């Protein structure tokens, strides 16, 4: 990398031998400009960051001017983002300080002994396209419920997946957007994290079929359903043709008898309508407010408890997301669909109960003839 952190060349913190003074020295050090240095560059930087925590734009400007990581150098103004950049960058900074290998595992899924539609196993692999923070215990892996000969996910109570798929294996020039898959857990009482993203996949394998199979294996291994875009239906046909239609969630904003013929056949949600776009963005926004960065008002958790979103690539995608030009934000699309999948009850149409009015004709019986009461 050509990036050099600011502390290696910050004016006023270079000693007379040309070496940077990172931390506050026990004794004053003579600087290259013949001035005494009594404070470290990193200590100065950390104090400035602490003093600017309440002003998101000023903090991002300071990060851009004095970057310690590559992500600092490309910070955006919070006004330009749809989501809460302060929380997103708090989480990114926290993640940067972690030893990633202790929290995330890169790997691949494969069918046991190469036999499809049996059991799926996860294997750590430095070349794998999956990044996971949690795998279920043995008794929760590969849980499938069979109803009337159809396969359904056995861990729907634990979480769900969201997917931004593609239909064409390759395009001229080798471009094209990535396929993306995210897994997130619900609040649960099992031995699993709650409201936490546990899987990230953002890649474009050599063929679309490889992508479809990898998505299918992830769903089978975790035993969780998937909410995918049905604008690009090949992934959903792959699930249906292999007997996993029960894993593909129907769009949560419509009752079953209001679904189109294709939606009943394949499931999925059209991610092109304005209502769905707004619901999708609101789902991501709500998740960020509740589970990313610090909760300074202690509304959802303790003030000093950091959020649990460990996938920095997705965080960076959220920071740049443009709702009017969504094509290149694969990670945001799939992660938003995953959040919608675990809170589908929020999008279900309300049943309008109408009172049945039964008007019986009533008569007043006085005299020889009865009289209709109006």
Which residues are covered by each model-predicted region?
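RNase H-like, metal-dependent nuclease domains and their acidic two-metal-ion catalytic environment used
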Residues: 4, 10-251, 290-374
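Short alpha-helix plus adjacent loop in nuclease-associated cores
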Residues: 248-296
């Amino acid at each position: 990398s050509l990036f050099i952190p600011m502390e290696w060349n910050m004016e006023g913190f270079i000693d007379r031998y040309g070496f940077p003074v990172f931390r506050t020295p026990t004794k004053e050090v003579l600087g290259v400009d013949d001035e005494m240095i009594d404070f470290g560059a990193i200590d100065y930087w950390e104090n400035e960051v602490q003093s600017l925590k309440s002003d998101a734009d000023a903090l991002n400007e300071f990060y851009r001017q004095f970057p310690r990581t590559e992500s600092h150098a490309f910070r955006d103004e919070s006004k330009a983002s749809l989501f809460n950049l302060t929380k997103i960058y708090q989480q990114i900074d926290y993640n940067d300080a972690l030893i990633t290998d202790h929290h995330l595992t890169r790997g691949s899924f494969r069918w046991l002994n190469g036999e499809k539609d049996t059991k799926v196993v996860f294997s750590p692999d430095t070349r794998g396209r999956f990044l996971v923070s949690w795998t279920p215990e043995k008794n929760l892996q590969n849980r499938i419920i069979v109803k009337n000969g159809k396969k359904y996910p056995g861990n729907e109570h634990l979480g769900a997946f969201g997917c931004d798929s593609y239909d064409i294996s390759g395009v001229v020039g080798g471009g094209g957007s990535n396929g993306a898959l995210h897994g997130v857990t619900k609040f649960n009482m099992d031995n699993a994290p709650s409201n936490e993203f546990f899987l990230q996949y953002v890649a474009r394998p050599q063929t679309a079929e490889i992508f479809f199979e990898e998505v299918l294996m992830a769903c089978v291994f975790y035993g969780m359903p998937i909410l995918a875009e049905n604008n690009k239906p090949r992934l959903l046909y792959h699930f249906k043709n292999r007997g996993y239609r029960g894993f593909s969630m129907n769009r949560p904003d419509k009752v079953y008898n209001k679904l189109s013929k294709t939606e009943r056949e394949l499931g999925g949600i059209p991610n092109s309508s304005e209502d769905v776009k707004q619901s999708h963005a609101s789902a991501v926004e709500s998740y960020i407010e509740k589970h990313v960065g610090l909760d300074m008002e202690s509304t959802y958790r303790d003030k000093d408890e950091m959020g649990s979103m460990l996938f920095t690539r997705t965080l960076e995608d959220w920071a740049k997301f443009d709702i009017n030009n969504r094509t290149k934000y694969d990670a945001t699309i799939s992660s938003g669909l995953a959040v919608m999948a675990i809170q589908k009850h929020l999008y279900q149409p309300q049943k309008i109960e109408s009172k049945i009015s039964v008007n019986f004709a009533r008569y007043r019986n006085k005299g020889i003839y009865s009289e209709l009461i109006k």
